[in-house]
């Protein structure tokens, strides 16, 4: 479904993968923080008519569902993530629905990666742990999205596959930009029907350039996965998170 067709909470869906990307303007390096979708955090709840019912602690991925699948959902997520990270201001957001995943895979082309674990092997033997495989538009959604919902913390395990692909995807986009400087603009235009953002193409170019100076290692919000009464939960280690926020966003002299 294209984003333009979304209007209500019923259309919005949940936030499946949540990343915070920070660029150090002095060093022009990126740091990436991954927030597990089942993280228990303070979110704002709304009734179907859009009236706020106040704040509650729940899975952070649900915050997106209380919006409209467009700007409102993104703004709600931006606020929830900022609160989780001790009030760090977040300037921009970029959201892509599942329809855009295979489109990115088609436009970027074949990417070779090493399968990081065995979480997909039973479902698809092609993705055997340690195997070198090719990810493209035909199988990228399977690689990034599939999880066994019968297994506890399957979303947390799946996150490692997403990190692996992201780390390989960015250099491939950089390679294509060297050959064709307009590639990123064309890519963003092609997937625009499936995305919501308040950032211009120039910001993406800056971030991609900064990625070339970075290791692209992704840090998880510190915590542990636990089994809730109904669904999996991820409980944040607040002390370790505070240390991560300080080391990522502040210069301590």
Functional labels for PLM-detected ranges:
Residues 1-253:
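Non-catalytic, solvent-exposed segments at the cell envelope interface
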